[in-house]
């Protein structure tokens, strides 16, 4: 085997790999395959951006980072709420578990704002479904 010092450096960067999702090729029996959909928070992030900064855009890389951030926070809250429900011998995660999980995960003032916004959103949803 040759050592690493003898190898030639790569002449160009490797080709970027494209994601294999969203294929519409035909299968063996001639039927079209359904597209694989990847759910993201991109449209919601974009709507919030336009509400706060109407003249500002966002790159795909930034959108990907924010999407990962939202997924991470969602997973942390869900995991903590699940633990809280298990501690209290409950099989259902209620708004109370979510609220407590948010208070445990998010620091100080951020938790207070998140709880108040969450309460406001649940109240708004409840009033719209009853009307």
From Swiss-Prot:
UniProt crosslink position (Glycyl lysine isopeptide (Lys-Gly) (interchain with G-Cter in SUMO)): 7-8, 17-18
Stated family: Belongs to the histone H2B family.
Keyword Phosphoprotein: yes
Residues the record lists as N6-butyryllysine modifications: 22
Biased composition (Basic and acidic residues): 1-19
Compartments where found: Nucleus; Chromosome
UniProt keyword list: Acetylation, Chromosome, DNA-binding, Isopeptide bond, Methylation, Nucleosome core, Nucleus, Phosphoprotein, Ubl conjugation
Something else known: Present with 443000 molecules/cell in log phase SD medium.
Gene responsible for this protein: HTB2
Name of the featured protein: Histone H2B.2
